[in-house]
Regions:
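Periplasmic-binding protein-like
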Residues: 51, 124-135, 202, 206-245, ...
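Catalytic and substrate-binding regions of cell-wall glycan-acting enzymes that process beta-1,4-linked
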Residues: 377-448
Length: 554
């Protein structure tokens, strides 16, 4: 019997060791010529991407977005640098895969079986719905039979493939495809009335509705679609295994959940009238106060300070609430006194005091709070008080969450109204649900303001170019006929060229190319696990979310 027990023990030990070895080999089939071995030996993960709602370049020329941070996390997990090449269209990123110029294609891409002959996909990490959108104020189609106008989609996408399938059911369905416009540009064209319909995913639509509230959803397609990364098809699966391992760890560490909260949670609901009122106020009211927001914003983005003020008072310097808070930043008397503000109804004084108070709160926050999250903790304290903010952090820890992550803490804010929770806390009852909505609203307004100002700047830039071109065309210096009357020669040209409708000068089958400014700085970005840089300039460091594994204790 003892020998039998020993034999069982030996078998168990051998089985465990074999399982460990096999498990590592399945996860990391690291032969000398494997793709993952090449990536690690070269010290570089090559990503080919298209500007999209999931990966983009912000105002500071920094790469941002869900896909960007995820790619950065994967490169950090492998212990290599990240090289991202931004391409102008989807076809080029798949060409990069086929030609061996990229390891992974990233662009908020939906699973598309038409691509599987030459590519394969990694794990899916988001689910979206394809939606047909139209311009608010026009007739809402109830099905594809009701399409009456120009339907435009980006070529090479799952949306184009979907329309090809739908054409079998709707033989009269017509559409156009283009590789010259980004997702955001097509949605902007729809908002401006240049096209009538497009098919897009629910995330892109939700984000752009904050900037162009005229975008309206006609109906959803029934099936959800997975968002995924693409790789070149081959018999060698080492990169697939590494990706699967990384995504499993990302789920365990809640990296995916945190990124979803950071980029998308605040746009889950949409109020057309509220957004329209805000957009109109950007044009009509903001110019009066923008210099003051810029002057006193200190360490935060002035547009975020403006969004806070809109949430507080709708940019009304005389606003007063029943609780006694007053002014554009709705300061209490004690707060105003602490910040040295004598007149809360003076717009400049109010903005100065509000900005100073936010900076004061930020300085008081524990250093353990993640950098990206500090402003949201500060805003919750601005709304309900610093003590209640500390209480909800304590409650979060009591309930097993991370008190230093806004993702965990905001979920517990509504619990401050429940006696079984607030009775255990230092400062007691608080309207935590209001603080939750307060922060989410500010995030939405900030996103709307940033996006709308960028869109307006691009349009003005295009208009300026058109005006310069028109001036050149009709300038007397450019008239070729000697002695011709300038006014006689200018008139016909002026009548033919409409600045508003310059796009109409192009053939309907040839869409104009994207201007360099609108391509969002196409090019190469070489990123180490702890910094972001292009090939000639080094920018500010970008923190990488930590991911750990038994083999990769980074």
């Amino acid at each position: 019997m003892n020998n039998l027990k020993v034999n069982y023990l030996i078998i168990l030990v051998i089985t465990l060791l074999a399982t460990m070895v096999i498990g590592f080999n399945v996860r990391w089939p690291n032969t000398q010529d494997s793709q993952i071995n090449r990536i690690i030996s070269q010290g570089e993960l090559r990503i080919s991407a298209v500007s999209s709602p999931l990966i983009y370049i912000d105002e500071q020329k920094q790469l941002r977005g869900f896909d960007y941070e995820l790619a950065q996390g994967f490169a950090s997990y492998l212990g290599v640098k990240l090289k991202i090449t931004i391409r102008p269209n989807f076809e080029q990123i798949f060409d990069d895969l086929e030609n061996g110029d990229a390891d992974i294609a990233v662009a908020g891409l939906l699973y598309n079986k038409e691509r599987l002959a030459k590519t394969k996909t990694g794990p899916s990490y988001l689910n979206v719905t394809q939606q047909l959108v139209y311009r608010k104020g026009t007739t809402r189609p109830k099905s594809f039979n009701d399409i009456d106008g120009k339907l435009l989609v980006t070529s090479g996408t799952a949306h184009a493939s979907t329309l090809k399938e739908l054409a079998k059911e709707y033989p009269n369905l017509k559409w156009e495809e283009t590789s010259q416009y980004t997702t955001n540009q097509i949605l902007e064209m729809l908002a401006d009335g240049e096209i009538d319909y497009t098919l897009e995913d629910s995330i892109a639509i939700a984000l752009q509705q904050r900037i162009h509230p005229q975008i309206a959803v006609a109906f959803d397609l029934l099936d959800d679609h997975a968002v995924t990364w693409y790789m070149r098809r081959s018999q060698e699966n080492s990169l697939d295994a590494a990706l699967l391992d990384f995504f499993n760890l990302s789920n365990e560490s809640e990296l995916l959940a945190r990124l979803n909260e950071k980029y998308f949670s605040h746009v889950e609901s949409f109020d057309y009238f509220d957004t329209m009122a805000f957009i109109k106020a950007i044009d009509n009211k903001l110019p009066d106060y923008q210099p003051l927001f810029e002057k006193y914003a200190q360490e935060i983005d002035w547009k975020l300070l403006a969004a806070i003020a809109w949430q507080e008072s709708h940019w009304d310097p005389l606003a007063t609430s029943p609780t006694g808070v007053r002014g554009l930043m709705m300061l209490t008397k004690p707060t105003a006194a602490t910040m040295g503000i004598a007149d809360r109804l003076d717009a400049e004084e109010s903005i100065k005091g509000g900005a100073a108070y936010i900076a004061y709160i930020m300085d008081r926050l524990p250093e353990s709070i993640a950098e990206d999250d500090r402003i949201w903790f500060a805003l919750s304290a601005y709304n309900m008080g610093y003590g209640h903010m500390q209480d909800v952090r304590k409650l979060t820890e009591m309930l097993g969450g991370d008190p230093n992550r806004w993702f965990d803490v905001k979920a517990r804010l509504p619990l401050l109204t429940q006696k079984k929770y607030y009775s255990q806390l230092t400062y007691g009852y608080a309207r935590g649900h209001e603080a939750y909505r307060y922060v989410e609203n500010i995030r939405r307004y900030h996103q709307s303001l940033v996006g709308y100002l960028q869109s307006r700047e691009r349009k003005q830039h295009t208009l300026d170019i058109a005006q310069k071109s028109l001036t050149y065309l009709i300038s007397p210096d450019n008239l070729k006929t000697t002695g011709a009357n300038p006014t006689e020669n200018q008139s016909p040209i002026t009548e033919k060229v409409s600045i508003k409708n310059l796009g109409a000068m192009s053939s309907s089958n040839q869409t104009p190319k994207i201007h360099n400014m609108e391509k969002l700085s196409l090019g190469h970005y070489l990123i180490s696990p702890y910094s972001l840089q292009d090939e000639t300039e080094t920018d500010n460091p970008v923190p990488v979310p930590p991911l750990k594994s038994p083999d990769n204790p980074l």
